[in-house]
Amino acid sequence: MKQSIQRLSALLLALALTLSLTLSVSAAETTSVLEATAEKAASAVMSYGQAAQVSWAVWQDGKIISSGSQRPEIDSTGAHLEGQGDIYGIGSVSKIFTTVAVMQLVEQGKLDLDKPVVQYLPAFKMADSRYKDITVRMLLNHSSGLMGSSFGSALLLGDASQQATEELLARLSTQRLKADPGAYSVYCNDGFTLAQLVVEAVSETGFMDYLRKHVFEPAGLKETWSPASSFELRRAPIYQAGVVEDPLPKECLGVVGAGGLYATAEDLAAFGGALTDDTLLKASSRKAMAAPEYANGLWPQEDFPDSLGYGLGWDHVEWYPFAQNGITALVKGGDTGYYHAGLVVLPERKMAAAVLSTGGASTYNEMAASQLLIAALREQNVEVAEIRFKLPAAKKAALPAELLDSAGYYGSQVMLKVELAEDGTLTMSYLDLPDLPARKFYYHDDGTFRDEGGSSALRMVKESNGQTYLYQWTFTSLSGLGNLPGSNYAAVKLPENSVDPSIQAKWEEQMSFLPMNERYSSQSYLLLGTALKELAEAEEATENAPGYIGNLRIDSETHASYTAQIPGTAGRDGYDVDLRRDDKGALWMECSNGTLGMDLAAVPELSTGKDNAAACTIQPNGYARWYKVGDKAAGKTLSVQVPKDAGFWAYDAAGNVVGSSLLWKDAPVELPEDGLIVFAGNPGAKFQLTFQ
């Protein structure tokens, strides 16, 4: 299965724009140290992550002490900069808002963190009896055992539909769990969408109405919004390089509680500040959120710090380098297709910093926010030492014979092939990233495999659950952003799975599945072009582990299942896959997270109709209508009359987007030879087509 619709979620392109930059800094009370640090950190975010625009804010003791932006120069008037600053999507930092709402209901005695979710959501059911053991706490600490992200029609453009949230319970009803509830914490978006539904059920209030009354207003947040809010003149623009020069429509995530909120850097920093006192939560609730929940389940037992360590909602409750200096630091990052956010809170110091960007990565933003806080503390004569961790001294050694059995295939978000030689050389290849060169590590007498520079190391660990994990240690230094330590399980060894070679071959046939049940406004259609390009440019098939297709275990000719159990993030977003053929022989792929795809080979040819006029009607099942551009239509100019809540996308043979009602409204499209066109909308929606 060379390509599948699931790969689209990984095709979130970094924006590399060559634009003139202006630096805007405003501060009530600031000094050159903090300003210089902010400018340097923002530049680093733009450099390392290719971010197009960055904004930041630092809050202390009830007020913003510094804020600013590095942004493209739009025009000389700066009209779009009215108010506090530009508004960005904050992605998964929204999870902290959801967590606060849950904890408020706990304080009111309306919720119990350790009661089953089904007690509050009787409609919540799954095709796995263990779902009854999932508690509210497990939703907030990522240990529910849910597969991960049921994000069909969740990542949208210019469309604030909440379809993904509304359909979550139906999607979960056919899913199984990937782990026992509470076994370990692994990043899980669906848990927070469920938590949003719990808040609505218990409070008997719409989620956004609840947040406005009980979170935004008490915290004084006037620049925090849902995707349905109107703030277009203030929204930080987003782009899709190589597709369209103009800014894209507003990015809308239909899972607000998991990642859909928008805010300014100032508002987000102020929200973090509100979590340093009793403004939103009692001290006991804030303490509960900051507890090391990750330690309740499977987790590497190492002395080195990592970039993850879940609390309730928080990504890390012992964030480097503050924890190593006796300072409590809480962090949450957020990444959407186009926006990235980092929030760091120092509750004991009554400080918080937020860094938001278009393009880039939340990790860089979190590191930048840390640098701002370090600089602010330095101005107050509080030094935070950025301790450089090193591996303990060890010498190269011959490989113990018993470790040779650790060679094999390891699964995570990427597939790894680990080869071991008797001289102690470990060669690690990235199977689904064949362009990346293999890495070599060398065995040392302390049991680690280290690279030549000593900047990273691996070790095989046999855990209490009987599985063998590939533990990784890293320590990275980035100018302007500080250091980033890593100490986590990167992958798990895949058990042997013997299947008939003919079945393996069928799964490995080059197939490209087209999205069939995504909304017309889905980012999948925009990003599909990249997947089609990859398919066209691929010279050879990706290697798979015997008995596996990617990280899925082949169970039969038509079913493959997700089996990796890894804490942290390496084991996130699993799904099972079923293949079937319809009565016309077309091959379909059904993923357990609700995604549905049809093989490109089954797409019919577009008809120009009678007298160069035709119609296309969406099927009763709501599935999209795909067509190939054949000889009859190639070269003609197509005009489309688009019905309400519907749209079309057109691609050339190389996968480039050449037409879109979402991007270019009713502009006619010159149909390219061997191209594709898709029409999507509600059941019965009728498109009128005119060819010239």
Features from the language model and the residues they span:
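Bacterial N-terminal signal peptides
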Residues: 12-22
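A short, well-structured edge-of-sheet supersecondary motif
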Residues: 43-81, 113, 156-158, 162, ...
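Short, surface-exposed loop or secondary-structure junction motifs
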Residues: 74, 129-337, 341-342
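Sec-dependent signal peptide cleavage junction
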Residues: 21-29
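Extracytoplasmic/secreted proteins, especially bacterial periplasmic and envelope-associated proteins
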Residues: 33, 37-41, 92, 97-101, ...
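Short active-site loop at a secondary-structure junction
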Residues: 47-55, 77-139, 178-190, 256-259
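Catalytic loop of the DD-peptidase/beta-lactamase superfamily, centered on the K-T-G motif
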Residues: 29-67, 212, 252-692
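Bacterial N-terminal signal peptides that target proteins for export
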Residues: 1-12
